[in-house]
Amino acid sequence: MVKVAVMLAQGFEEIEALTVVDVLRRANITCDMVGFEEQVTGSHAIQVRTDRVFDGDLSDYDMIVLPGGMPGSAHLRDNQALIQELQSFEREGKKLAAICAAPIALNQAGLLKNKQYTCYDGVQEQILDGHYVKETVVVDGQLTTSRGPSTALAFAYELVEQLGGDAETLRTGMLYRDVFGKNH
């Protein structure tokens, strides 16, 4: 059974983090909210109790997801133990995903070199490596990136597909197709 760690740092973007957790859990994918602390507060003052406190080891997970938000993304970027785990996942061929401003952590880890990625408008100016593409969701090998709060559902459905879940049933059941059409 696949297992996903959604990393929560103080100042994370609630829509991006909780949408991913909700959709993955609806798909019956094991998904833990892993925080730098037991309780974290999002960028819009929503407090969340994490499932697990980050101890520097995420090796029992198959995917790490980095939500955006500020200063949450900066906290992710600046945590050396997390950067080492991202690099380890990349070496092992495990999946990594980041949305909004969180690709700055992938950049800090040196994982965007020769990769296509997307992010929140303007954040690409902080990223020296990689090739920015203004798309809703970008997949390049084991890396998946997305733009921001309004793309969180599309991002989450892509992750479900990558992890072997039935994203189409979720899209239908959550009325995503009714609202956004068949091309999304």
Task: Describe the function of each predicted region.
Residues 121-125:
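Short, acidic/turn-prone active-site loops that include or flank metal/cofactor-
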Residues 1-92, 96, 105-108, 113-114, ...:
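Extended, subdomain-level signal for the structured scaffold at the beginning of enzyme domains
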Residues 137:
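Conserved catalytic-core motifs of GNAT/GCN5-like acyltransferases
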Residues 117:
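Anionic-ligand binding patches
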Residues 99-100:
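Short, thiol/selenol-centered motifs that function as redox-active sites or metal-ligating centers
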